[in-house]
Amino acid sequence: MRNSYLLILAFPLAVGAQWNKHVIVESSGMINSAVAADWNGDGRMDVIASLDDKVILFEGPEWGAHTLHVFGSGQSRNKPRSACIHSCLMDVDGDGDQDFIGSNNTVFWLECPAKRLGGPWKYRTVDDEILGTHCLITADVNQDGQIDLIANSGRTAEKTSIPNSLTWLQVPQNPHSAECWIRHVFARGDAPGASHYTGFGDVNGDGRPDISCAAKGGDAFPGGEWFAWWEQPKDPTQAWEKHLLAVNQPGATNIMPADLDGDGHTDYFATRGHGQGVLWFKGPKFVQIEIDPEIIFPHSLDLGDLDNDGDLDAVTSSKDPVDVTAWYENNGRGKFTRRVIASKQGSYDTRAIDMDNDGDKDILIAGHTSNNVVWLENPLNNQER
């Protein structure tokens, strides 16, 4: 493992600005997910990523490595892989700091201790029956004022009792001693194929947040190749109604809700991360509109105002280092312009977040088959200075 250096690779935008690529770590194996927060309280972003059979915190801005957990036998009934497939942050135990949640066959959490860089973080199980969890996101699903966890269970009935399903999980009253979290399967067997990433938001304006998902298909994953959303009922612990947005979508992976054109209706931004193309669905009828049919394997997606003009833009990257990292500039009315900011950089996970505290959103990338974690520096406020 190598870390802590700056690689200057300049990629021009259409307007002439350039994004600099900062390398946080390089590995001998795949890195699928990375998250950022300030854990040591120095006002600078740190990064947690899973690689080389470990979960590691990289202390910014020099990116010194602190091992938080080493995967091994006996921690769960499921054999772990060398790295998590996805991760997120949540203050699980309500003590005011960000704990780490990961999916590595088992969904687990690591408790952030008072001495955050002083040694391992305590490993605890969230759920060991949910398998094939490509996405973990947090939100208040039942609107009780407490943050919940949303996780897909994308494996078949041969491997789990919750096959091809979507779930949300409540934190138990005492998460330190609980054997698992409180699981609600809201789409039981209703998400066939290889379900990937989820989105959260009230789509139909009934005041209850809904959940979206996408799934790739193929011979190994029958029933996939769709984008869909599930409507939350009055009782969120019961089954939710599925609404298909589109079928015959080879490689479908990502779908996130937002009002993209400023008309007051929720739209969806989507990608085919195991196929080709970026698109959006214009609400309320969800008319499918192709944005960039050429980009290959746009496996990661995040939404954010990247140019600080008051509307939401999007960023994605090819999962393997075969194509580009690009953001799509929104004119506020749903017309998107592709801006290439890197090339030959793989990404399984991309986050739009201000990494250098300069007031604009940068791009944090877990490089997948590029075997690295990098961040791309938004030049917006550099130009203004």
Predicted segments, located by residue:
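Positively charged n-region of N-terminal signal peptides that target proteins for export
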Residues: M1-S4
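Short helix-onset patch at the extreme N-terminus, typifying the N->h transition
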Residues: L6-I8, I48
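Hydrophobic h-region of N-terminal signal peptides that target proteins for export
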Residues: L9-A17
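Beta-propeller-forming repeat regions
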Residues: G16-R385
